[in-house]
């Protein structure tokens, strides 16, 4: 599933082609996504794009009459293409732009979303979200406070959007490795110093992935069709049985809440 770096990479890739241009119309080939594509999107016509923003894993396209909310789901990606390029099997939604380009949404598993709202504030998919991990609001003191009474393992807690948004399976595993923290540790057992370190490395790992265009394991593509190259720098995720790049110990894979977790039993305590 695309996580924060992949969504932010998509935002940065499509923004220059959308802001200042006008959506002439939308083409919805298959509206049966995780939720049905909102009827308002079918009727889009002559709507200038004012901004392209991101909140958590949602892309937010600001138009004069409202907002398009896009979630990439498990396998979605957005590409900027020439209008004349014919669609392929899993190309479900196009926004045809006034500059001769098209924003094309591809999603083999159809678990993403294209929603419409007049107002962002109070929309059900955006409520109850924690702070952005790259913001000043997410820091060691905040993390320590939220972990203090949490009797659950730190790995699934990091993936809870109420704690912090956008840190999914890949980046939780990678960040815990970078901080030297075992994923099975109780959140409440982390000291303030450990939380400060963990908050710092989460930011560093996410920023590095954004620099590399995110992580492509299967379906994700950047807006120009290129894969995300952070996959080449993964330290533990997807490396079960391979030697740790630091100590040589074989990487271990377990499951938390049906999600794969990768770690080094020597480097993470």
UniProtKB/Swiss-Prot annotation:
GO BP terms, alphabetized = base-excision repair; DNA damage response
Q: What is the effect of changing residue 174 to Q?
A: Strong decrease of glycosylase activity; slight decrease of AP lyase activity
Question: What is the protein name for this chain?
Answer: Formamidopyrimidine-DNA glycosylase
Primary role = Involved in base excision repair of DNA damaged by oxidation or by mutagenic agents. Acts as a DNA glycosylase that recognizes and removes damaged bases. Has a preference for oxidized purines, such as 7,8-dihydro-8-oxoguanine (8-oxoG) and its derivatives such as guanidinohydantoin:C and spiroiminodihydantoin:C, however it also acts on thymine glycol:G, 5,6-dihydrouracil:G and 5-hydroxyuracil:G. Has AP (apurinic/apyrimidinic) lyase activity and introduces nicks in the DNA strand.
Tell me what the record says results from residue 218 to T.
Slight increase of substrate affinity and decrease of activity
Domain comment text? The zinc-finger is necessary for DNA binding.
What quaternary structure, including any partners, is listed in this protein's UniProt entry?
Answer: Monomer.
Top-level taxon of origin: Bacteria
**Example of a GO MF term:** oxidized purine nucleobase lesion DNA N-glycosylase activity
Start and end residues, zinc fingers (FPG-type)? 235-269
Q: How is the cofactor bound?
A: Binds 1 zinc ion per subunit.
What gene is it encoded by?
mutM
GO CC entries: cytoplasm
Q: Which SUPFAM superfamilies match?
A: Glucocorticoid receptor-like (DNA-binding domain) (SSF57716), N-terminal domain of MutM-like DNA repair proteins (SSF81624), S13-like H2TH domain (SSF46946)
- Keywords linked to the UniProt accession: DNA damage, DNA repair, DNA-binding, Glycosidase, Hydrolase, Lyase, Metal-binding, Multifunctional enzyme, Zinc, Zinc-finger
- Could you read off the lineage of the organism from its UniProt record? Bacteria, Pseudomonadati, Pseudomonadota, Gammaproteobacteria, Enterobacterales
Q: Where does DNA bind?
A: 90, 109, 150
Family per record: Belongs to the FPG family.
Q: Give the E.C. number(s).
A: 3.2.2.23, 4.2.99.18
Could you tell me which Pfam families the record lists for this protein? Fapy_DNA_glyco (PF01149), H2TH (PF06831), zf-FPG_IleRS (PF06827)
Keyword Transmembrane helix attributed: no
Taxonomic source organism: Escherichia coli (strain K12)
Q: Which cofactor does it need?
A: Zn(2+)
Per the Swiss-Prot or TrEMBL record, the active site comprises 2 (schiff-base intermediate with dna), 3 (proton donor), 57 (proton donor), 259 (proton donor)
Please write the reaction equations for the catalytic activity of this protein: Hydrolysis of DNA containing ring-opened 7-methylguanine residues, releasing 2,6-diamino-4-hydroxy-5-(N-methyl)formamidopyrimidine; 2'-deoxyribonucleotide-(2'-deoxyribose 5'-phosphate)-2'-deoxyribonucleotide-DNA = a 3'-end 2'-deoxyribonucleotide-(2,3-dehydro-2,3-deoxyribose 5'-phosphate)-DNA + a 5'-end 5'-phospho-2'-deoxyribonucleoside-DNA + H(+)
Under the heading PANTHER family, the entry gives: FORMAMIDOPYRIMIDINE-DNA GLYCOSYLASE
């Amino acid at each position: 599933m695309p996580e924060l770096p992949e969504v932010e990479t998509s935002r940065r890739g499509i923004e220059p082609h959308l802001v200042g241009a006008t959506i002439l119309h939308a083409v919805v080939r298959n509206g049966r996504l995780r939720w049905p594509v909102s009827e308002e999107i079918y009727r889009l016509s002559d709507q200038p794009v004012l901004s392209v923003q991101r909140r958590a894993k949602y892309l937010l396209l600001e138009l004069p009459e409202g907002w398009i909310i896009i979630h990439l789901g498990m396998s979605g990606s957005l590409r900027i293409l020439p209008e004349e390029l014919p669609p392929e099997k899993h190309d479900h939604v196009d926004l045809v732009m006034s500059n001769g380009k098209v924003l094309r949404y591809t999603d083999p598993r159809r678990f993403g979303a294209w929603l419409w709202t007049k107002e962002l504030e109070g929309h059900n998919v955006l409520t109850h979200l924690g702070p952005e991990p790259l913001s000043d609001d997410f820091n060691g003191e905040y993390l320590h406070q939220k972990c203090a009474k949490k009797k659950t393992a730190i790995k699934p807690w990091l993936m809870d959007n109420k704690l912090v948004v956008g840190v999914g399976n890949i980046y939780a595993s990678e960040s815990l490795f970078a901080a030297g923290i075992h994923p099975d540790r109780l959140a409440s057992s982390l000291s303030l110093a450990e939380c400060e370190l963990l908050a710092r490395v989460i930011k560093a790992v996410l920023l590095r992935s954004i620099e590399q265009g995110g992580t492509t394991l299967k379906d994700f593509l950047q807006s120009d069709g290129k894969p995300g190259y952070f996959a080449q720098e993964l330290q533990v995720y997807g490396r079960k049985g391979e030697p740790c790049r630091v100590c040589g110990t074989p990487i271990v894979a377990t499951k938390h809440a049906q999600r794969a977790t990768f770690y080094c039993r020597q480097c993470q305590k």
